[in-house]
UniProtKB/Swiss-Prot annotation:
This is Phosphoglycerate kinase. One of its GO terms (molecular function) is ATP binding. SUPFAM superfamilies: Phosphoglycerate kinase. Pathway: Carbohydrate degradation; glycolysis; pyruvate from D-glyceraldehyde 3-phosphate: step 2/5. Its EC number is 2.7.2.3. It comes from the Bacteria. The gene is pgk. Keywords: ATP-binding, Cytoplasm, Glycolysis, Kinase, Nucleotide-binding, Transferase. It comes from Rhodopseudomonas palustris (strain ATCC BAA-98 / CGA009).
């Protein structure tokens, strides 16, 4: 990802038909958009292109339709987008063919048009060359501003980059710059915090991180698997016992790479998985057989703080406890607040991503204090795993 990629600074868009791939996959309830975060994220690129006199043609998917399906139409999303950007947004009820061509032909410079859900055509996800060619006829250049879909080699996220001059939008550019700063060319030492329920979903991520960071904090349910692998009795806690050999392999790999692994040294446990259940802090040698670990304990929180203090860069994915239940949010909230404080003091570059992580940082009230928050989900994880992202690769200057 340290390779260079073309941005909007490299192209004159006046009078050009710009096919702009955006992420409009917003939550809906009864035909109304309930969270406009993703619409706000695409606003800078749309308004810049429109202001420079481009004909801005939006391409996006919505949901997982099997063919045309009105409840996955982008029409209400286009209306919500118009409210957010405070500009009219036209709508065409297909993304190819006559409806799209006619609507585009009627555009004036600076106009914005949203084409219908690209996934109404199964060829979108197959990256079908004939479908890509039909889309390419509608534009002069392609701008990808959907990092969240960059791990998919679909027609509108990757295929168009082989047919039209390709550029990164401002949201994509910001994401690539932030991620590059965090793992590819970071200020060292780098610490990663990885939490969440299961090791099984994050094996590739852990194996990549131990070769890139100087310290790795493992928390959440997945820490129990590592503790079990080391002979700790974890009671009724969530634990993937069959992955003990995998956990030991990751620990060995970390040691060989000189990456310090920071596991819990104590735990906050309860007998019931529910909010405000009576909870107790125990050392790892005393976890009751009928209790479950739901958060890191007070000494573990101190260790996480110390690790953050020693770091210049932090990459975070996944909560370190059952943060959705009080009081088992304490470890995650305190670590988040500590990282935010260091960031605000100019002592830490902090990058976080993944759905649960963003929710946890919002819950802690510190999301705005991190250097960068990625809303990308799957693409953020694949980047952390060190995998090439097709929608980014195609933007790079060869």
């Amino acid at each position: 990802m340290t390779k260079t990629f073309r941005t909007l600074d490299d192209v004159d868009v006046k009078g050009k038909r710009v096919l702009l791939r955006v992420d409009l996959n917003v939550p809906m309830d009864a035909g109304k958009v309930t969270d406009t975060t993703r619409l706000e994220r695409v606003m800078p690129t749309i308004t810049e292109l429109s202001g420079k006199g481009a004909k801005v043609i939006l391409l996006a998917h919505f949901g997982r339709p099997k063919g045309r399906d009105d409840k996955n139409s982008l029409k209400p999303v286009a209306a919500a987008l118009a409210d957010v950007i405070k500009k009219p947004v036209g709508f065409a009820d297909d993304c190819i063919g006559e409806p799209a061509a006619k609507a585009i032909a009627a555009m004036a410079d600076g106009d914005i048009l949203c084409l219908e859900n690209t996934r109404f055509h199964p060829e979108e996800e197959k990256n079908d060359p004939a479908f890509v060619a039909k889309l390419a006829e509608l534009g002069d250049i392609w701008v990808n501003d959907a990092f969240s879909a960059a791990h998919r080699a679909h027609a509108t996220t990757e295929g168009l980059g082989h047919k039209l001059p390709a550029y990164a939008g401002r949201t994509m550019q910001a994401e690539l710059v932030a991620l590059n700063k965090a793992l590819e060319a970071p200020v060292k030492p780098v610490i990663a915090i990885v939490g969440g329920a299961k090791v099984s979903t994050k094996i590739d991520l852990l194996e990549n991180l131990v070769t890139k960071v100087q310290a790795l904090v493992i928390g959440g349910g997945m820490a129990n698997t590592f503790l079990h692998a080391q002979g700790v009795k974890v009671g009724k806690s969530l634990c993937e016992k069959d992955l003990a050999p995998t956990a030991l392999r990751i620990l060995d790999k970390a040691e060989a790479a000189n990456c310090a692994i920071i596991l819990p040294v104590d735990a906050t446990v309860a007998y019931h998985f529910e909010a405000n259940a009576p909870s107790f802090a125990y050392g790892l040698d005393a976890i009751p057989d009928d209790a479950m670990i739901l958060d890191v304990g007070p000494r573990s929180i101190e260790r996480i703080h110390a690790a953050i203090d020693d770091a210049a860069t932090l990459v975070w994915n996944g909560p370190v406890g059952a943060f959705e239940l009080t009081p088992f949010d304490k470890g995650t909230v305190e670590a988040a607040k500590h990282a935010a404080k260091r960031t605000k003091a100019g002592k830490l570059v902090s990058v976080a991503g993944g759905g649960d992580t963003v929710a946890a940082l919002n819950h802690a009230g510190v999301a705005d204090d991190f250097t960068y928050i990625s809303t990308a989900g799957g693409a953020f994880l694949e980047w952390m795993e060190g995998k090439p992202l097709p929608g980014v690769e195609v933007l790079q200057v060869k």
